[in-house]
Amino acid sequence: MTITANKRHYLEKVSHQGIISALAFDQRGALKQMMAAHQEGEATVTQIETLKVLVSEELTPYASSILLDPEYGLLATKVRANQTGLLLAYEKTGYDATTTSRLPDCLVEWSVKRLKAAGADAIKFLLYYDVDGDEQINLQKQAYIERIGSECTAEDIPFFLELLSYDERISDNNSAAYAKLKPHKVNGAMSVFSDKRFGVDVLKVEVPVNMAYVEGFTEGEVHYSQAEAIKAFQDQEAASHLPYIYLSAGVSAKLFQETLYFAAAAGAQFSGVLCGRATWAGSVPVYITKGEDEARKWLCTEGFQNIDELNRVLEETASPWTEKI
């Protein structure tokens, strides 16, 4: 694929030598739930904004870029390390759990133009997609992504599309029932949104198997042999010509690192990660129960260790996006 000089410039700002080692902290609903588990009452705006600032201050020196949201993360954008690029999220958090459609929705007071003016080097939008889902729902979702792609083209800024697969008939994505479908769901969605009419520059995707069911990665029930898991990663590489990066999906830092080694050995030429909770999740209970200073200490020690180890893994496993663009 080819991109404009401006888009290439911005992609270089969010990566290091073609590898995207990005820190994801655009969580809103999930972060509120994590905080609420350690205190009485809901998390306050100040609590959320402050933790985002702490993470940005302490960990962005070791990340090629950080993904934040404009609802609670604008203060954090101001304190990131000078060389660290910025992705801003464009979607509202969560989805309507009373329906299976999971239709996308933008932050209504924002546009790509405004996110760019706020300092974004790239735009990220999250889409829930069931490749086998209701045809009319999927047509709506495709049209929605076309609009965002057109906005990003008009502003000449990279479009990162985050795809989260699901099945309209299965409520638990961690279930064995969904694990059997996951390779098809993940790779099928990637194939759909690689069409150039969507204007996507980089895909942010799940690994195509649930590693908790892979032979050699679990002491419980196995739903993928090693060979089947390898095939899923190979099919993922074949599903798109676009650069793609992995999300950590809330798994532990150790499992995520092991997964990246497995993916690379299988032939997946991913160009980095947007890693969130696997890096910073442990700071949340410390921040809520012990305060800012202790949270900062955690980020400087365990948080740094998580991101430093991940960077070392990426050096050995990731392929530069420049090989595809």
Swiss-Prot record:
One of the record's GO molecular function terms: tagatose-6-phosphate kinase activity
SUPFAM superfamilies: Aldolase
Annotated metabolic or biological route of this protein: Carbohydrate metabolism; D-tagatose 6-phosphate degradation; D-glyceraldehyde 3-phosphate and glycerone phosphate from D-tagatose 6-phosphate: step 2/2
Keywords from the UniProt entry: Lactose metabolism, Lyase
A Pfam family this chain is assigned to: DeoC
EC number: 4.1.2.40
Biological-process GO terms, alphabetical: 6-sulfoquinovose(1-) catabolic process; D-tagatose 6-phosphate catabolic process; lactose catabolic process via tagatose-6-phosphate
Enzymatic reactions: D-tagatofuranose 1,6-bisphosphate = D-glyceraldehyde 3-phosphate + dihydroxyacetone phosphate
Family under the similarity heading: Belongs to the aldolase LacD family.
Name listed for the protein in its UniProt record: Tagatose 1,6-diphosphate aldolase 1
Organism in which the protein naturally occurs: Streptococcus pyogenes serotype M1
